[in-house]
Amino acid sequence: MAPKKTATKATAAKGNDRQKALDAALALIEKDFGKGAVMRLGDENRPPIQTISSGNTAIDIALGIGGFPRGRIVEVYGPESSGKTTVALHAIAQAQKAGGIAAFIDAEHALDPDYARKLGVDTDALLVSQPDTGEQALEIADMLVRSGAIDIIVIDSVAALTPKAEIEGEMGDSHVGLQARLMSQALRKMTGALYNSGTTAIFINQLREKIGVMFGSPETTTGGKALKFYASVRCDIRRIQTLKDGQDAIGNRTRLKVVKNKVSPPFKIAEFDIMYGEGISRESSVIDLAVDNGIVKKSGSWFTYEGEQLGQGKEKVRLSLKENPELTDELEDKIFKKLGVGKYAAASDELTDDPVELVPNVDFDDEADTEADAED
């Protein structure tokens, strides 16, 4: 019996010594690197993930936390004219409405100020850079992030971040993996600065097709593998339908799939309408989600909310909600509350989402391995 007690005491003493050593190490780390340099994952003092709303209810719900995460990298990619820049501009508009400062790195030299203004962007306050080289673009982005004053920065697009050596070289010169190395170096530098400043960085990316793929999707994104690894959220956006008023096309039905999400369960899907000259229709998404969640009743073509008829036909109800933003806010708040998203996330103890069957259909091989990729 005595040997067993002795062993127990020895184990306890050893445990106390280890705890004292750990406490001393933590105190030294805190002294050298500041409070919060090391913390326990379950510590209640650990700040929750802050967000910047996308400006659309369906996208905020698909992201799982009510918007794009602050201090993280987000990649938005898809085919041409699918709505990538529109999504980013709406996020900028929301950040500005909340009193934040936004920056736009226009590497494609294609930003339309009039369109941005229609989406709600304060173009007078928006910081815009049209760099000559990829190095210049990423250096400007890094300096803005490290200032600590920027809430959101958009880089449009990764494919247009042309290395200086390629610009100064001759047509036909081979520059294998140059852009991939540039992105890898820049993201290594920016990741920590983004977290410390709470800045959201949205990288817009294009699709390419790999040559000779026999099985699976030949699609891949530009800029190598670094962005795929460093991004906390990756969104695949596609047009799925043209919206028409009679014979006239008035917009696109668009699907956004969250193919990677480090802050919430991934593979969620959002469908929304992008109206020409107007941007993403918030009201249309609110109507769809309110009906799906039983908040608004639909009987035939009539929509009813709390016993009061909203109108006949989705388009009329959409226009009615646009003229009554208070009602739109009320419906959106009830949707978030029922689904436990955004400020209601802490009150939701269990997942209410149906099992997700869709999976990413993009092959993520490094473009740096095959610079012979064919453009769309």
From Swiss-Prot:
The residues listed in the UniProt record as binding ATP, with positions renumbered to this chain, are 78-85
Disulfides per UniProt: none
| Keywords from the UniProt entry | ATP-binding, Cytoplasm, DNA damage, DNA recombination, DNA repair, DNA-binding, Nucleotide-binding, SOS response
Composition bias (Acidic residues) maps to 363-376
Question: Which Pfam family is an annotated match for this chain, by its short name?
Answer: RecA_C
**GO cellular component term, pick one:** cytosol
Q: Which InterPro entries does the record cross-reference, listed alphabetically?
A: AAA+_ATPase, DNA_recomb/repair_RecA, DNA_recomb/repair_RecA_CS, P-loop_NTPase, RecA-like_C, RecA-like_N, RecA_ATP-bd, RecA_C_sf
Cellular location of this protein? Cytoplasm
Q: Region Disordered: which residues?
A: 355-376
The domain of life is: Bacteria
Q: Which GO terms describe its biological process?
A: DNA recombination; DNA repair; SOS response
- Tell me, what does this protein do in biology? Can catalyze the hydrolysis of ATP in the presence of single-stranded DNA, the ATP-dependent uptake of single-stranded DNA by duplex DNA, and the ATP-dependent hybridization of homologous single-stranded DNAs. It interacts with LexA causing its activation and leading to its autocatalytic cleavage.
- Family stated for the protein in its record: Belongs to the RecA family.
Name of the featured protein? Protein RecA
Gene encoding the protein: recA
